[in-house]
């Protein structure tokens, strides 16, 4: 699994991986490319990111903006041409263990900085309202 950053392509990284293996005497290893997609990035100054930050701050959360995620998703469909739209992840709820047997989402929270399911859903309404301003 290779995670790309801007200005990289899957083909370029695959070629570099094969060259790296060959230089170290592992040229006989077969690398199977099963698919992939381009990296994605959105400016922190994009209106959708500013709207997300505004909602989080109103709820007493000082957000940390991460330019890259440990996970992956095909965001390039939105951020690359021809759409060239901003994209970001947002929410006041909490979950973990994504895509695993122990995946969870907090339904009712006792932590004032972590919304339960209802607060998380309402945060999207607030976010869309902020974005529409």
Which sequence ranges carry the predicted segments?
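Short amphipathic alpha-helices in soluble, non-transmembrane regions
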Residues: 13-21
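Juxtamembrane "pre-transmembrane" interface segments
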Residues: 33-40
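Short, low-order "capping/linker" segments at domain edges
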Residues: 40-58
């Amino acid at each position: 699994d290779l995670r790309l950053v801007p200005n990289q392509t899957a083909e370029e990284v695959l070629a570099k991986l094969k060259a790296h293996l060959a230089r170290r005497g592992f040229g006989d290893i077969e690398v199977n490319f099963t698919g992939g997609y381009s990296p994605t990035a959105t400016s922190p100054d994009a209106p959708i990111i500013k709207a997300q930050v505004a909602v989080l701050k109103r709820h007493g959360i000082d957000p940390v903006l991460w330019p890259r995620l440990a996970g992956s998703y095909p965001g390039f469909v939105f951020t690359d041409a021809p759409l060239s739209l901003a994209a970001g992840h947002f929410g006041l709820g909490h979950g973990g263990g994504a895509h695993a047997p122990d995946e969870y989402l907090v339904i009712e929270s006792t932590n004032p900085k972590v919304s339960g399911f209802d607060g998380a859903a309402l945060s999207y309404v607030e976010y869309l309202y902020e974005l529409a301003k």
